[in-house]
Every structure is written in structure tokens, then in C-alpha cells.
Regions:
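Bacterial N-terminal signal peptides that target proteins for export
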Residues: 1-11
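A generic local structural motif
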Residues: 2-4, 18, 44
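Bacterial N-terminal signal peptides
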Residues: 10-19
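Surface-exposed repetitive/solenoidal architectures
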Residues: 25-306
Length: 306
């Protein structure tokens, strides 16, 4: 009889533990985040790489992470609706790579309508760092970054590394960014697509820095596509750095309909749009007013002659 009672008690304890570890509204695959504690619990759940598959997260309030024990979300595979809210007070200064509010977004992940404010300065290898996400293989849409980011390689204001399947759409960054290799206002390295995004933050403008390579207003290094993007943040310091560009530092993919209005400085391979183009590149400009006028006049003369 005692064994039966012990067994029943054990089952009761296990049942209670299970209910404690389940996320809010798990039955409907929707998680609501309204407090810093909610967000911290969500991050801990994402330690299991399959937990977030198919879930939708709704952020319903602005959050200030200052003084909290929040650690970056390890991996996310679902949909995160920021709903226009801001997560501020994000700070990270420990050793590591793939650092950001989210460390990794998989190909199925979507993060939209979210602003991140903070200071990100990982130590050690300090690669693939961005205020929103360290490495992105999913979709980041209508997001913004404010604050500062510093590191070594693949350092971006919003995203550290934008992978082959990664897409960054209609995003902005006003973050000050400092790095050594592949440093950009939106993303450090772009292997996917960056579209209709803009940067206003300064990139590597301090004198006391290691000699940087491949630095751009939108991306430091891009082997993917960059379309419809603008930069108005100063890039580089005089006589310091190689492959310094207003949109991209080192480009071997496609740039289309982009513009830069900021000063670009460096030692070698410095350009208003791209610092250096590698072979097999594509650069497409939109039609200029003068070209349109020339085409119209040519057509008119042809008609008059006939």
C-alpha cells in the first residue's frame, strides 16, 4: 500500500513540474510576452532548439532589460511579432560569438516590428555580432537598432552575419559600429538579401582602432544582393582601412538602386557606393533624368526623320 502511495505522490510531483515548465498559452502555440521575466523565461525555453518550431510570440509591451539576468535567446525558429515595441537596456560583454538579442535565427524564423536599444561588446573571438541577431538565416522585417556594437569579424548594427537564406527587409540602424573585418551598419557580412534598409550610424570613425578591412554603410562584405538601400552615416577614418564603401566595403554580388550621402574615408579602395568590386559582380542603376531625356529626344528625332 505504501508503494502505491509513493508512486502516486511521484506522479503528482512530475505532473506539477511539467505544468511549471510549459510556456504560457502553449496549447495554442502562441506565447505572450508582457514583462522582462516573461522574456527571460522565453529565452531559457529556446535553449532547446526544437522548442520554438511553429510558435508565434507576441510582444505586448516595451521592455527594459537593465539590471536583469536576461541572456541572449540561443536559437529561434518561429515567428516573433514585436508589434512596434522596444526592448532597451540590452548589454553583453562576455566572451563569445554569435551574439545579439537572438544568437541564431533559423531559415524558418521571422522577427518583425521590433526595436532593440543597447550596447553589445563581446570579448574573445567576438565574431558575428549584431544588436538584434548574431547570425540570421530567416527573415528580419521592419526592425531597428540603436546604441553601439563592437567586435572583431562580421559586426553589424542590426545583424552580424546574414546567411544565404537570410533576408533583411525595411530595417534601420542608428547604432555606432566598430570592428576589424566585415563591418556594416546593417550587417557585417551579407550572403543573402538586404532590401529597402537604411543606416544613419557611424561606422569605424575613431582613430584608435586596428586597421579595418571591408567596411560599409550597409554591409562590410556582400556576396548576396543589396537593393534599395541608403546610407547617411559616416564610414571610416582618414588614411585608415581598406575596402571602405558607402553601401558595401567589398562586393561580389549585386547592388541595385542604392545611394550614399555620407563621407567615406580610408587608406585604399574607398568608394561612395562600393570600396572594391570583386570579379563577376553586378551593379544596376535606376534610370537617371538625363538618360530619360536623351532617350525621349532620340525617339522624337527618329519620328521627325520619318
Amino acid at each position: 500500500m505504501k508503494q502505491i502511495q509513493r508512486g502516486a505522490a511521484l506522479l503528482t510531483v512530475l505532473a506539477l513540474l511539467c505544468t511549471l515548465t510549459l510556456p504560457a498559452a502553449a496549447a495554442s502555440d502562441t506565447v505572450t510576452i508582457a514583462t522582462v521575466q516573461d522574456f527571460t523565461n522565453f529565452s531559457k525555453q529556446c535553449t532547446r532548439d526544437t522548442w520554438s518550431q511553429g510558435i508565434t510570440v507576441e510582444l505586448t509591451a516595451d521592455l527594459d532589460l537593465s539590471g536583469s539576468d536576461f541572456t541572449p535567446v540561443p536559437i529561434f525558429q518561429g515567428t516573433f511579432h514585436g508589434n512596434g515595441h522596444t526592448i532597451s537596456g540590452f548589454s553583453f560583454e562576455k566572451k563569445g560569438s554569435k551574439t545579439g538579442l537572438f544568437r541564431t535565427l533559423t531559415a524558418s524564423a521571422v522577427v518583425e516590428d521590433l526595436t532593440v536599444e543597447g550596447d553589445l561588446a563581446p570579448q574573445g573571438s567576438a565574431s558575428q555580432a549584431g544588436l538584434l541577431v548574431g547570425e540570421n538565416y530567416g527573415t528580419v522585417s521592419r526592425c531597428a537598432a540603436q546604441g553601439s556594437v563592437s567586435g572583431q569579424e562580421d559586426i553589424g548594427g542590426l545583424v552580424g552575419l546574414n546567411g544565404e537564406s537570410g533576408c533583411i527587409q525595411s530595417c534601420t540602424s542608428a547604432a555606432a559600429v566598430t570592428g576589424v573585418t566585415n563591418v556594416g551598419g546593417i550587417t557585417g557580412q551579407n550572403l543573402g538579401a538586404v532590401e529597402n534598409s537604411s543606416n544613419t550610424g557611424e561606422i569605424n570613425t575613431q582613430a584608435d582602432q586596428e586597421t579595418p578591412t571591408s567596411v560599409g554603410g550597409i554591409a562590410g562584405l556582400s556576396r548576396g544582393t543589396i537593393r534599395g538601400c541608403t546610407n547617411s552615416g559616416a564610414v571610416g577614418y582618414q588614411h585608415v582601412g581598406y575596402n571602405m564603401g558607402g553601401i558595401v566595403g567589398l562586393q561580389s554580388g549585386e547592388i541595385s538602386n542604392c545611394s550614399n550621402t555620407a563621407p567615406i574615408q580610408g587608406r585604399k579602395d574607398v568608394g561612395g557606393i562600393a570600396g572594391q568590386f570583386e570579379p563577376n559582380t553586378s551593379l544596376t542603376y535606376g534610370p537617371s533624368p538625363s538618360q530619360q531625356l536623351t532617350n525621349s529626344l532620340s525617339s522624337l528625332f527618329d519620328q521627325l526623320e520619318h
